[in-house]
């Protein structure tokens, strides 16, 4: 089920990834490519473990990634 946090997360992650491909980014952070694709398409809610991995990689606050705070 798509919700506002999933949509905000997908938009923010796409922005942070820039020109990096899903394949490249998934390998860098150790998330299966298909799982990452589903996050970006708002087809799957992100796990806390993967959310932390992504936040750590980009050195970004989790609340910012989820759209609960502005950059």
What are these regions (language model features)?
Residues 30-45, 68:
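Recognition helix of helix-turn-helix/homeodomain-like DNA-binding domains
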Residues 64-71:
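Short amphipathic recognition helices of helix-turn-helix/homeodomain-type DNA-binding modules
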């Amino acid at each position: 089920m798509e919700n506002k946090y999933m949509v905000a997360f997908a938009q923010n992650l796409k922005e942070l990834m820039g020109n990096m491909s899903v394949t490249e980014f998934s390998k860098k952070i150790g998330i299966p490519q298909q799982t990452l694709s589903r996050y970006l398409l708002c087809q799957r809610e992100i796990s806390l473990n993967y959310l932390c991995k992504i936040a750590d990689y980009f050195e970004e606050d989790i609340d910012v990634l989820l759209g609960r705070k502005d950059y």
